[in-house]
Amino acid sequence: MVELIDGKQLAKQLNEETATRVAALKKRGITPGIAVILVGDDPASAIYTRNKHRKAEKLGMKSVLKTFPADASQEEVMACVQELNNDPSIHAILVQSPLPKHFDEKALDNAIIPEKDVDGFHPYNVGRLYNDDPDKRYPVSCTPRGVLKMLDHYNVDLDGKDVVVMGRSILVGKPMQSLLQNRNATVTMLSAHTKDEEFYMRHADILIVAIGHPQFVKAQDVKEGAVVIDVGINRLEDGSLCGDVDFENVKEKASLITPVPGGVGPMTIASLMAQTVDLAEWSEE
């Protein structure tokens, strides 16, 4: 019998914990602050940014939104990043993706100082994750962090398990691989260049999918009893949302699966808020 991962409920619990931590910091005179930089007028980005802004304020944090037109220059946005780097009231900075094509996104991400790099994209923080830095005081990309918290909540043992990660983005795939390997999982990462990807998928104890292809993973691709984590979110022609997994059919074979919507998405934002508080706490130590 398949069990559905309730991302909304887990996110609610995590947000409650975060609100408690924010209140404790405020008693010490510290208000966690997050700044989001939005460039252009992409509708989805505007919605995501607004959701993050509202959630931070609801949890009692300082939330700053910096907006720029699509024709803004790299230098203008870079200057904003440097200003926020030097602002002691801001503990977390992120640049909302995607950016207009004339931007060097990696350069912007690298300009955020490691101590405020809430997305975990700075090479210094990537290196600490890759090396499994024992003090754990470094930010990790928020979606993989949320996925790991889900797996832990549902007591999914990672030690020695065959885990397949589909998609190798810096946002999900690559940090997910490192987090899992740090927990002694045997990880295979698939990309568009992988030959016979169905072979790897069918042998996975845990399948994590983040490729942006609607309902790409079918029931015949999944091992009986596998844990399936669907990171994708896609809008179909009829306006409905779906993931990268054919949920209705795959759930008949999986032992544990995330729905879309209501699975990974809520945990990503909740993890972003929790990590902002982490950065605020670490800044005072």
From Swiss-Prot:
EC number(s) stated in the UniProt entry for this protein? 1.5.1.5, 3.5.4.9
Per the record, what are the reactions this protein catalyses?
(6R)-5,10-methylene-5,6,7,8-tetrahydrofolate + NADP(+) = (6R)-5,10-methenyltetrahydrofolate + NADPH; (6R)-5,10-methenyltetrahydrofolate + H2O = (6R)-10-formyltetrahydrofolate + H(+)
The entry marks the following residues as binding NADP(+), namely G167, R168, S169, I233
Q: Which Gene3D superfamilies match?
A: Leucine Dehydrogenase, chain A, domain 1, NAD(P)-binding Rossmann-like Domain
- Output the Gene Ontology cellular-component terms: cytosol
Which keywords does UniProt give here?
Answer: Amino-acid biosynthesis, Histidine biosynthesis, Hydrolase, Methionine biosynthesis, Multifunctional enzyme, NADP, One-carbon metabolism, Oxidoreductase, Purine biosynthesis
- What GO MF terms are annotated? methenyltetrahydrofolate cyclohydrolase activity; methylenetetrahydrofolate dehydrogenase (NADP+) activity
Tell me the pathway: One-carbon metabolism; tetrahydrofolate interconversion
Per its UniProt record, what NCBIfam families does this chain match?
A: PRK14186.1 (NF010783)
Family the entry assigns = Belongs to the tetrahydrofolate dehydrogenase/cyclohydrolase family.
Q: What does this protein do?
A: Catalyzes the oxidation of 5,10-methylenetetrahydrofolate to 5,10-methenyltetrahydrofolate and then the hydrolysis of 5,10-methenyltetrahydrofolate to 10-formyltetrahydrofolate.
UniProt cross-references to HAMAP family, sorted A to Z:
THF_DHG_CYH
**What is the protein's name according to its record?**
Bifunctional protein FolD
What organism is the protein native to?
Limosilactobacillus fermentum (strain NBRC 3956 / LMG 18251) (Lactobacillus fermentum)
Q: Which gene encodes it?
A: folD
